[in-house]
């Protein structure tokens, strides 16, 4: 009977750990750059669930990590929601009318993009 109880408790512990690990989300904090053959410029900075945009119609956005969306706001635009993706230092989103990849400063993807477009 003790063995069965121990096995059940161990199983519950493992399930709890797996569930908690899957809910853990990677921090998005940092500076994101738009890097292409024409430009290498700071696009926006994320701190927590908020971001400030350097250039463009929108001034800022709020991040909803559960839905993978952002809510763009600003004086020159009507608020709108856009889906985003984030993987390996690349934040892909439409903040200017066209979806672009933005690179987290000092990430491997950032350094690779700098090399690809001849900035390093």
Stretches with model-predicted labels:
Residues 4, 23-25, 88:
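N-terminal cationic leader/targeting segments used for protein routing and processing
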Residues 19-33, 45-47:
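N-terminal helix-cap/turn-to-beta initiation motif at the start of protein domains
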């Amino acid at each position: 009977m003790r063995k069965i109880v121990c096995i059940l408790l161990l199983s519950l512990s493992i399930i709890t750990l797996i569930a908690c690990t899957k809910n853990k989300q990677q921090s998005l904090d940092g500076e994101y750059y738009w890097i292409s053959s024409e430009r290498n410029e700071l696009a926006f900075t994320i701190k927590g669930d908020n971001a400030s945009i350097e250039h463009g119609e929108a001034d800022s956005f709020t991040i909803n990590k559960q839905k993978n969306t952002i809510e763009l706001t600003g004086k020159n635009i009507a608020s709108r929601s856009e889906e985003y993706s984030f993987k390996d230092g690349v934040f892909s989103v439409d903040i200017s009318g066209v979806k672009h990849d933005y690179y987290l400063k000092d990430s491997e993807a950032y350094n690779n993009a700098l090399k690809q477009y001849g900035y390093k």
